């Protein structure tokens, strides 16, 4: 039910760890359990480009008012006038925010974030961090990042990864 940031140099295995937790890759040894209801922000965002932000987000909301719920969530990070445009017209930072809202809006127990602040300026990074905190709702959030300031803002524990191994943990 907490927030942990995974940090390390490029190639340390951070994204591979997230892919293992999502079941997208198979571990060489050992067993990973307890990752059934997972939502994620991938480095590539993985949005449906011809849909708008509301439609992309509503896909993961299990509520008959999914569109309204998605709209309200998105307003926290995006300008109102952008919400109904196809995401293919968005900047990289706007797409990133839609992907973040979609992951946090899903009915998941665990949220995995792969570089969630990439493409965001400092103001929008701060808003995104505040959004993560407001929408955590007791879920486990694991974020891969290079940004120590964001880890501090999230009040996150930190796990330092080197060559695929956790070499330090700061809680």
Each language-model region and where it sits:
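Conserved ABC ATPase "signature" region
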Residues: 67-83
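Q-loop/switch helix immediately C-terminal to the Walker
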Residues: 51-63
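Conserved H-loop
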Residues: 139-144
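Helix N-cap at the start of a conserved alpha-helix in ABC-type nucleotide-binding domains
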Residues: 122-124
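Catalytic Walker B motif of ABC-type/P-loop ATPase nucleotide-binding domains
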Residues: 111-115
């Amino acid at each position: 039910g907490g927030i942990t940031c995974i940090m390390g140099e490029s190639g340390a295995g951070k994204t591979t760890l997230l892919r293992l937790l999502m079941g997208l890759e198979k571990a060489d040894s050992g067993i990973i359990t307890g990752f059934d209801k997972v939502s994620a922000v991938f480095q590539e965002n993985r949005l449906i480009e011809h849909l708008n932000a509301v439609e992309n987000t509503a896909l993961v909301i299990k509520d008959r008012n999914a569109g309204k719920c998605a709209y309200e969530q998105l307003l926290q990070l995006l300008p109102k006038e952008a919400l109904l445009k196809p995401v293919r017209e968005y900047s990289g930072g706007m797409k990133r925010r839609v992907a973040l809202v979609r992951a946090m809006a899903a009915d998941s127990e665990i949220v995995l974030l792969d570089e969630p602040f990439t493409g965001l300026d400092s103001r929008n990074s701060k808003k995104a961090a505040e959004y993560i905190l407001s929408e955590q709702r007791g879920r486990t959030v694991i974020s891969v990042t290079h940004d120590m300031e964001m880890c501090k803002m999230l009040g996150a524990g930190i796990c330092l990864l080197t060559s695929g191994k956790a070499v330090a943990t700061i809680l």
